[in-house]
């Protein structure tokens, strides 16, 4: 080892440099030889010239170097100025605008249906004169329904096809029947126009109670919620159990529209009380009255027990079931105290019957039942 | 001189044993491909082959034609870098 060290350290720089050069040239020669072997093998195996194109093709695909043309020989805006005739509307359209035009013309693109729906929604808006900027309002969700739009509902299907084929020729006449893609409603069903604006519920059509007669109102009110929204003055078209309005509201509306005597609420809630009264089973009723003595007696209830015929008019803050039970308890208390109490229970029961009964029933068969009891 | 040759032999041996030679080779090959040296030389090969005729080309023909040209065509940057590395190695291991 010592000998090697001594020999190595004895080298001077020139020799080192020469050595470095030698090593370098060895490396380069290795690289060249490697290439030669590769090429030779490719030649002998026959794949050396495979990646070349033949001369003929070379001439065909040569790079074009003329002015006004790109390297493939194509003119840049060759089709820009050409015009095509639309097969649908037979107008001549610029080539670059042809595709979007066709989309709208045929009514088949994404945008075209959106625009059509929006147009219809805004035309309905103008027709119904509703206040339209209420997106974040609760009442927006009322399926308000316009009487006028019901007429247009019948034309909906034919309009759809007609509308699409003639779309671009429709003048901006909002009242034209062709443009009325309608807003036909059953309870809770959405119209087409809603789909165009997913964030705006269909608020622009609703029942205007002023236009309806009393019979119509009554029939409406028996099936629908009917609560009049403050903002649009229209009636809610949802079912009787619509979650947006309370029973109190519904009752108030009926009182308002139909008059005090005719208010009726065919609710499922009150089945317990009204049905058993209708069955005229006084005993059962009495037992029910005595059963529930624990519910609160609202002040309006005691007032109603005095005013037997008109207690349905009073607006009770509590929910219906509770107030009716409260009434029961007063009746029960009355019943328990004997004949004097019996008469008061009679009146309270009369009040009960008035509130729950349908308007056509005669007021009290109650005295006859309690004659038996007494 | 024999000392020199002995010394050279030693160094070469060290170069190989430590794997530095292989590394340098790979480095050179990569750099030459990168800078287009390979393609240039290949084109030259094509000419030679077309000249000599496809069937009768031998390895010797190619080597004789290609190697001198190859040596010349190596770009300066590649050469410098390689020499630098070799000198570094020598400096580290020769003294």
Swiss-Prot record, chain B:
Location(s), subcellular: Nucleus, Nucleoplasm
Q: Sorted alphabetically, which InterPro entries does this protein's record hold?
A: TF_ENY2, TF_EnY2_sf
**Cellular component GO terms, alphabetical:** DUBm complex; nuclear pore; nucleoplasm; SAGA complex; transcription export complex 2
Keyword line: Activator, Chromatin regulator, mRNA transport, Nucleus, Protein transport, Transcription, Transcription regulation, Translocation, Transport
GO BP annotations, alphabetical order? chromatin organization; mRNA export from nucleus; positive regulation of DNA-templated transcription; protein transport; transcription elongation by RNA polymerase II
Q: Which domain of life is it from?
A: Eukaryota
Matching Pfam families: EnY2 (PF10163)
Mostly located where? nucleus
Q: What's one GO MF term for it?
A: transcription coactivator activity
* Entry's family note: Belongs to the ENY2 family.
Q: Which HAMAP family match?
A: ENY2_Sus1
What does the function comment of this entry state? Answer: Involved in mRNA export coupled transcription activation by association with both the TREX-2 and the SAGA complexes. The transcription regulatory histone acetylation (HAT) complex SAGA is a multiprotein complex that activates transcription by remodeling chromatin and mediating histone acetylation and deubiquitination. Within the SAGA complex, participates in a subcomplex that specifically deubiquitinates histones. The SAGA complex is recruited to specific gene promoters by activators, where it is required for transcription.
Per UniProt, subunit arrangement is: Component of the nuclear pore complex (NPC)-associated TREX-2 complex (transcription and export complex 2). Component of the SAGA transcription coactivator-HAT complex. Within the SAGA complex, participates in a subcomplex of SAGA called the DUB module (deubiquitination module).
Q: List the PANTHER family hit by this protein, alphabetically.
A: ENHANCER OF YELLOW 2 TRANSCRIPTION FACTOR
What name appears for this protein in its UniProt entry? Transcription and mRNA export factor ENY2-2
Gene name of the encoded protein: eny2-2
